[in-house]
Amino acid sequence: MYWLQGDDGKSVAHKLYLDPYMDLFNSEIVSFHIGQTPSAAGIQSALNEAIRVTSDCPYRRTFHSDQGWAYQMKSYTKRLKEERIFQSMSRKGNCLDNSVMENFFGLLKQEIYYGRIYHSYEELKTAIEEYIVYYNEHRIKKSLGWLSPAQYRRKHLAA
């Protein structure tokens, strides 16, 4: 959320929408879209980037999501079928099915959002973009042998 001053001089909260795609091999965010409103075009753009980035995957790809409206769009499901990507969805009302992504959102909020006030969409968008670079390149994880997601990927590609 970011805050803007309304016509009456009071601060008004505005939402920002983040649609990330995570590779579960190493928890790396491979693509994302940030917008001021939920956007089918933005989600499709992030989907296309995730497909491009993972195109050399030697195994069947599975894209998991919650049951949000965007992931049920015909254009979204058609694109997955064209690429022979299996679509997996969380059960309705069960955040545990999407716990890896929920964990990422929790870290993001804890590390750049709580206790900070953002005064514009651009300020918050930039902070999120910078955090995703930090998360991928520098934020170590115990489950990855104390490596960052990008370091873990490079280590396994070199092997």
What feature does the model see in each segment?
Residues 1-159:
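Charged DNA-binding/catalytic regions of mobile-element recombinases
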